[in-house]
Amino acid sequence: KIGTEGAYPPWNSKDASGNLIGFEVELAQELCKIMKYECTIVEQDWDGMIPALVMRKFDAIMAGMSITDERKKTITFSQGYADEVASLAVMKGSSLEGMDTPEGINLSLGGSSVKKALKTLTDALAGKTVCTQTGTIHQNFLESGDVGSVNVRTYKTQDEVNLDLTSGRCDVALAAAVAFTDYADKSGKPVVLVGPTFSGGAFGNGVGVGIRQ
C-alpha cells in the first residue's frame, strides 16, 4: 500500500469521480509495474501521513513529501525523485509584488546574500497574514524566526490555502511554487509568485518516497 494525500495538485489530487490522480499516482503505478507488485494507493490526511506510515497503515508515502533532517528522525527516504522549490504567492496587484530579492535562496548555503534576502522578506512580511498548510516545511520555516514574527494562519489542505488567498483572508501564502502555478492555470485566478524561491535548509533536499525505518 502507498499513502498519498489526494489534495496537493499537481503532485496528487482527485478527479470529479473521486479517483486519485496526479504525477505521483502515475509514478507509483509505473514503479509497481516495474517491480511487479500489486499496489493499492490509499488516501491519507497530510497531518497524519507519517504517523500512519509508522503504524503500518501503508508501506510507503508518495505525497510531495520533502526529504528533511527532521523527518529522517522518524522515517527513511528513497533517493529524491523530484526537485521542489517553495514560493510566496499573492493576488495580482498586491503591494508585495516587485520585492527586491534574489531569484532564489538556498538556505543551506547561508552567507551575506541569504541574510540580506531574509531581512528584505522580514520587512516586507511585517504585519502581514501568511497562510500555509499545517504540518509542512513551509509552516516550519514561517515559524522559525528566519522572517521575523509573522502572523501565520494554517490550513488542513492546500485547497483551503488557495481559497483564502483568493478571497482576501490571506495577504500572502507559502507553498511549493508548482502548487500555486497549477492552481492559477486551472482556476484562472490572478495568483502570482513573489519574492525568491526557497530551497535547502528547512525546505529539504527534493521529494522522495517515505519508508518506515
Where are these regions (language model features)?
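Short, hydrophobic alpha-helical packing/hinge segments within bilobed ligand-binding/sensory domains
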Residues: L27-A28, M49-A52, F58, H138, ...
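A conserved helix-loop-strand patch within extracytoplasmic ligand-binding domains
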Residues: Y37, S66-I67, K73-V130, G135
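Periplasmic-binding protein-like
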Residues: G6, D83-S87, V178-T181, D185-Q213
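A local structural motif
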Residues: Q29-E43, A124-A126, S144-T157, R169
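Alpha-to-beta junction loops
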Residues: K36-E38, Q44, V54-A63, K128-T129, ...
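Short secondary-structure boundary segments
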Residues: G6, M65-S66, K92, T134, ...
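Extracytoplasmic small-molecule ligand-binding "clamshell" domains
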Residues: K1-M65, K73
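Short helix-initiation/N-cap motifs at beta->coil->alpha
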Residues: V25, T40-P51, V114-A117, V152-S167
